[in-house]
Design a protein with these regions (language model features):
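N-terminal pre-domains immediately preceding structured catalytic cores
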Residues: 2-12, 20-202, 206-278
Length: 278
């Protein structure tokens, strides 16, 4: 009797196992196939960081910022503000490579920046008296004198657009009614953000330059944080963030070829929309 029961149980198990095969097969067939990963400018779509994707800005389309340049603190963020400035002020920390747009609720929007050689000479307080969309660029007399081989080919200037070293936006800083020739601006050199560059003033990712530009009005105060304050507020590690980057040689033929192609598509541009206090 026990043998009969055991045999019957075995047959039942076998029968149930057979019945389960089509069900399992049907379940397996119902699993959707994954689509191939999509890429944007060589970046996997799934890795594009929110706020730094493709950005259509008027006639121009900005590429996404590669995620390797947005690691850790090197991206835009709303953070508690622990500095000493009042709401509505821009505070630049050239040591920790941050720019703060101070809010009224004890918070600030913190942007990562790069600080060029000219920017390292900034100190004290200035005021934004001019804002330009897609600004053109001309090297200063000091730049031409200091490194004629690099800047000489650009003495005639580069019109506003994707090829301009000032990027998508520029904020022009004045003191006592006079242009200081210091700028807060975008950049095409995304790898420089978070570091010290060989040239330029205060650089931002173009996405961040546009974001800041749209927030700050003309007349905004801009204050540069001292190294001592940077250490007190950020800590010694962040106050010494980044590395000194070597000079980057840019082929003028490539730049002006890009300008010619841009002019063929959009017409001859110099500066885009200009807002200024006169």
């Amino acid at each position: 009797m026990k043998n009969q029961i055991a045999a019957a149980t075995a047959r039942l198990r076998h029968f149930l196992a057979i019945l389960s095969l089509p069900v399992l097969g049907a379940c397996a067939a119902a699993v959707p196939q994954l689509e191939p990963e999509q890429f944007v400018n060589g970046i996997p779509f799934s890795q594009i960081v929110d706020g730094y994707g493709i950005l259509q800005d008027g006639e121009f389309s900005l590429p996404p910022v590669p995620p390797e340049y947005l690691q850790g603190v090197n991206r835009r963020a709303v953070v508690p503000y622990t500095g000493y400035q009042s709401a509505g002020t821009i505070e630049i920390d050239p040591h920790a490579k941050f720019l703060y747009w101070v809010q009224s609720d004890g918070m600030a929007i913190r942007y990562p920046i790069a600080v060029g050689r000219e920017g390292r000479g900034m100190s004290g307080e200035t005021v934004i008296r001019r804002k330009v969309e897609w600004p053109g660029w001309t090297p200063t007399a000091n730049m031409l004198r200091r490194e004629p081989a690099i800047y000489g080919p650009f003495a005639g200037g580069v019109p506003g657009g994707l090829a301009s070293p000032l990027g998508a936006r520029a904020l022009y800083l004045y003191r006592g009614g006079r242009d200081t020739y210091y700028r807060i601006h975008g950049t095409n050199d995304m790898s420089s953000i978070g570091n010290s560059g060989s040239a330029g003033c205060i650089r931002m990712f173009n996405h961040d330059a546009i974001d800041l530009f749209d927030r700050v009005p003309l007349g905004t105060r801009v204050v540069v944080r001292t190294y001592a304050d940077s250490v007190r507020i950020e800590g010694e590690a962040l106050a010494n963030r980044g590395v000194e980057l070597p000079p980057v040689y840019v082929d003028p033929q490539q730049v002006y070829a890009a300008v010619a192609a841009q002019n063929a598509r959009h017409g001859n541009l110099n500066d885009g929309v200009v807002n200024e206090v006169r």
